[in-house]
């Protein structure tokens, strides 16, 4: 098997040291790891073979900067470490492919569904997979109707923005506890 060079972004993420260890100790081939992060001193900086400080994934030149790093380091596979960059990467899929880099991401439609909680719930429900009860909200009136539909104020209601990652945008509205 040929040796590989893998680029891993978000080198300061808690899971990245374990992922790097898996790449390095894979038992099949030599894997050279290039790390990038928007912090100058991410936790995995000294575990990687090369490191680059990059702007946030939302920066307009982010993909161009990563393309340059991939060319310079002869990257074979780009393994995104943070979901914030995936949407931008899939839009530049062909640019990475053109320089021989495989993006370790799903196609743009799958990314769109996975990054949108409402679309995910709708797709799962259409496939017959049980999902929690939900009510899509787009306006203040939708919000009021949705709260009533979900049983508020007798029952607490959980809100989640459709495009937030992790626990961003999660709110619990409980008439017995909420001051708002």
Language model segments and positions:
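ATP-binding N-terminal substructure of ATP-dependent carboxylate-amine bond-forming enzymes
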Residues: 1-105, 141
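Mixed-charge, polar/low-complexity N-terminal
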Residues: 27, 32-33, 110, 116-118
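Histidine-centered beta-alpha loop that forms part of the nucleotide-sugar donor binding/catalytic region
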Residues: 83, 108, 162
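A short, histidine- and acid-enriched strand-loop-helix "catalytic/donor-clamping" loop
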Residues: 105-111
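Active-site nucleotide/adenylate-binding loops and adjacent lid/helix of ATP-dependent enzymes
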Residues: 111-180
């Amino acid at each position: 098997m040929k040796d590989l060079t893998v680029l891993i972004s978000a080198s300061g993420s808690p899971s990245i040291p374990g992922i790097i260890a898996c790449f390095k100790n894979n038992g099949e081939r030599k894997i050279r790891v290039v790390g990038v992060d928007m912090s100058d001193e991410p936790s995995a900086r000294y575990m990687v073979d090369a490191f680059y400080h990059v702007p946030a994934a939302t920066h307009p030149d982010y993909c161009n900067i990563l393309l340059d790093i991939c060319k310079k380091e002869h990257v074979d596979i780009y393994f995104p470490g943070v979901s914030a960059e995936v949407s931008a990467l899939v839009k530049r899929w062909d640019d990475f492919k053109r320089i021989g880099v495989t993006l370790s991401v799903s196609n743009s439609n799958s990314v769109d569904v996975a990054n949108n909680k409402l679309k995910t719930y709708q797709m799962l429900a259409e496939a017959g997979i049980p999902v929690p009860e939900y009510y899509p909200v787009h306006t203040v009136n939708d919000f009021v109707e949705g709260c009533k539909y979900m049983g508020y104020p007798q029952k607490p209601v959980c809100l989640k923005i459709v495009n937030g990652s992790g626990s961003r945008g999660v709110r619990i509205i409980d008439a017995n506890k909420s001051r708002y």
